[in-house]
């Protein structure tokens, strides 16, 4: 037997609170905790603007493209069942809208200034209310005497979806007769006096399938859940799917698109303020190629998407360098090192420089001249006389960068004098310790390498940006997670992704493991103002397949690696993009 609620797209939408002085045992909660629907002919709570915005968004939203498919479904049903249409007394509707069905009490509870509910077809279900009882301005409101009177209207009228909006007896009849496809349910997280309760939801028939963000309004928190009939719930969900937890399953299935899921995704986006969606709208027209890519599953898009988000939605701030930035806080990227080496392809990167700097860190060096002699200029601007003097390091020799990364990795806690001193056996050799733990205590949760030494920060030419990494061993594979406090998306982050990936490959090899994942956590992520135009160019480039990285398999000691022990194979890339460093 066909489900009428499915054919004619009938839904319920409601908001319920906790009931003051209910008999529910203290501390024992369930889905039935939220059941308070009304009190003394109105809502139990004062106006909740977030819930009202959600209600309006859900019941007003229509999708013209999806409507044609919904109409085809309904027409097919009526043709199959030889349904004869009778349009007598049913008003014609040209504009596509949703239907809202309510009882007499619910209609009367709506403030006059909001009657009838705009951009919706208002239907009142009442055995006593007559058309002549309504004011002339409500001439387009439809009155029906029973639930059965609704179906001739649904068969004839142009509409997108039909929402049952109250009250309790109306909800109950539609639920009892199995005429509800989904329930859009607001949970108002506060207790109020209630004299009307929402009817019990049959949890064998309906299950919660979606839960929104949590909001605050009128001194209470609230969220929105969607109850779906159990037959419509996806039986198999792959938690490893890239879109799991972020996108409704039906959205990305071109062959079996679930229009309800598309709409639900839109409903849950109701509270995204328009001024935030295009915060930096002056840049919007520069991303034609980037926006033309429908599915951005290539792992490089993790990086590119962050840049796009910051350019479009970032906060405009002044910064230490005086250049100014667009910034946001908190991102994560994850790269599968067992499949590829994440060396960005949308611009050519200086691979040799990345490796030389990493080897320099591993040796515990702080002398910038060592890198300059190899024509690696990553630290050049931070070692100048002017830069060191600005850091109040007047006594420091040019290119003496102080107790930065490598010093902390190999000599944490040692007293720093200058770049020429011998620090052998001084301080804590963190790198040696983590390799020892990986080899001998691989399940340890303390395999951490930290460059953030508060005592030494003022002595450093530049306090560390990538400050901490942790390693994880499982099934013969090594993963690394790194936290970066300050993230220069244009210049620094591409190097950091590659550097810590190489570092993970190296440690995996000397510990007789295989590389697994590199996870990159970004704190203050920013785009310098003088990098924006260059990054627009980069975002409109399409990534190529990542290359692979091969290490000399004979190397078993982390300190024995040299530049000749690294081979990057099949690095296909776009041209170099120049950006000035903000120092």
UniProtKB/Swiss-Prot annotation:
Active site: 465
UniProt effect for mutating residue 106 to I: In pyrimethamine resistance
Annotated GO biological process: dTMP biosynthetic process; methylation; one-carbon metabolic process; tetrahydrofolate biosynthetic process
Pathway the protein takes part in: Cofactor biosynthesis; tetrahydrofolate biosynthesis; 5,6,7,8-tetrahydrofolate from 7,8-dihydrofolate: step 1/1
A Pfam family this chain is assigned to: Thymidylat_synt
Residue ranges of every copy of the DHFR domain listed in the record: 9-229
Positions that bind substrate: 51, 165, 171, 186
MF GO annotations: dihydrofolate reductase activity; thymidylate synthase activity
Residues engaged in binding NADP(+): 36-42, 104-106, 125-128, 166-173
Keywords: Methyltransferase, Multifunctional enzyme, NADP, Nucleotide biosynthesis, One-carbon metabolism, Oxidoreductase, Transferase
Catalytic activity line of the entry: (6S)-5,6,7,8-tetrahydrofolate + NADP(+) = 7,8-dihydrofolate + NADPH + H(+); dUMP + (6R)-5,10-methylene-5,6,7,8-tetrahydrofolate = 7,8-dihydrofolate + dTMP
GO cellular component: cytosol; mitochondrion
Annotated region (Thymidylate synthase), positions in chain: 298-583
Gene3D superfamilies according to UniProt: 6.10.250.2210, Dihydrofolate Reductase, subunit A (3.40.430.10), Thymidylate synthase/dCMP hydroxymethylase domain (3.30.572.10)
Binding of dUMP, residues: 320, 466, 484-488, 496, 526-528
InterPro entries: DHFR-like_dom_sf, DHFR-TS, DHFR_CS, DHFR_dom, Thymidate_synth/dCMP_Mease, Thymidate_synth/dCMP_Mease_dom, Thymidate_synth/dCMP_Mease_sf, Thymidylate_synthase
Function of the protein: Bifunctional enzyme. Involved in de novo dTMP biosynthesis. Key enzyme in folate metabolism. Catalyzes an essential reaction for de novo glycine and purine synthesis, DNA precursor synthesis, and for the conversion of dUMP to dTMP.
Family of the protein in this entry: In the N-terminal section; belongs to the dihydrofolate reductase family. In the C-terminal section; belongs to the thymidylate synthase family.
Subunit and partners: Homodimer.
Protein's UniProt name: Bifunctional dihydrofolate reductase-thymidylate synthase
